[in-house]
UniProtKB/Swiss-Prot annotation:
May function to silence the spindle checkpoint and allow mitosis to proceed through anaphase by binding MAD2L1 after it has become dissociated from the MAD2L1-CDC20 complex. Residues 45-78 are annotated as: Interaction with MAD2L1. It is found in: Nucleus; Cytoplasm, Cytoskeleton, Spindle. Interacts with MAD2L1. It comes from Homo sapiens. The modification Phosphoserine is found at residue 102. One of its GO terms (biological process) is deactivation of mitotic spindle assembly checkpoint. This is MAD2L1-binding protein.
Length: 274
């Protein structure tokens, strides 16, 4: 999936890297603290979360690239689609299974009735094509603008989804690739934190649902695929997980987030089941 992993920056290349590394020691306690505070502190009524919300902070030991932020988003989307049973296999396995069947896969397909095999293959191809289109346009979007927040909405509609998941990137100050940590190493840290939080184990098995992606970007970024939603408000129900990424201390970048608006993917893509 990713190119061979580059070396993580030395402490000489990244100021205060030693300070960042110490922050990892408090990672587990931060998860517990945020989960506790989410049920105690009053929240804005328009974005109130239910008591079972899972808040997962992930602290990276240094800066990350804008390309890395995009990959975090894409991999989280794939992960949620599989964990919430919208895809029968993880995305990469599914793509390999249907586009270049292994001998075992070919043998399984032979055992199924021809009509069933054709329908299943057609549904899979459509689901993969729709998801790949969204992933591709997310890459273009991240190349145009900083993206402080992303929402992944399942079921219902964009205003009232059955479930929604948030990725908060607003505390990151993206750097160029050669100044940043290895994206592969950051992905391992991200998903380790999600697995430790056990965010999906208590959720009931859902039906197949439509999925919509919302992302914040600069109002003048020139985006022409994602549709601007000037008055969009984050849903008040259905929240399941927020992953907050940071580099261990407030971002040095001073960004006028009031100039950033929500954009909505113009497609609602649906997974499939065999």
């Amino acid at each position: 999936m990713a190119a061979p992993e580059a070396e993580v920056l030395s402490s000489a290349a990244v100021p205060d890297l030693e300070w960042y590394e110490k922050s990892e020691e408090t990672h587990a306690s931060q998860i517990e603290l945020l989960e506790t505070s989410s049920t105690q502190e009053p929240l804005n009524a328009s974005e109130a979360f239910c008591p079972r919300d899972c808040m997962v902070p992930v602290v990276f030991p240094g800066p990350v690239s804008q390309e890395g932020c995009c990959q975090f988003t894409c991999e989280l989307l794939k992960h949620i689609m599989y964990q919430r049973q919208q895809l029968p296999l993880p995305y990469e396995q599914l793509k390999h299974f249907y586009r270049k069947p292994s001998p075992q896969a070919e043998e399984m397909l032979k055992k199924k009735p021809r009509a069933t095999t054709e329908v299943s293959s057609r549904k899979c191809q459509q689901a993969l094509a729709e998801l790949e289109s969204v992933l591709s346009h997310l890459e273009d979007f991240f190349a145009r603008t900083l993206v402080p927040r992303v929402l992944i909405l399942l079921g219902g509609n964009a205003l009232s989804p059955k479930e929604f998941y948030e990725l908060d990137l607003s505390l990151l100050a993206p750097y160029s690739v050669d100044q940043s940590l290895s994206t592969a190493a950051c992905l391992r840290r991200l998903f380790r934190a999600i697995f430790m939080a056990d965010a999906f184990s208590e959720l009931q098995a859902p039906p197949l649902m439509g999925t919509v992606v919302m992302a914040q970007g600069h109002r003048n970024c020139g985006e022409d695929w994602f549709r601007p939603k000037l008055n969009y408000r984050v849903p008040s129900r259905g929240h399941k997980l927020t992953v907050t990424l940071s580099c261990g201390r407030p971002s040095i970048r001073t960004t006028a987030w009031e100039d950033y608006i929500w954009f909505q993917a113009p497609v609602t893509f649906k997974g499939f089941r065999e």
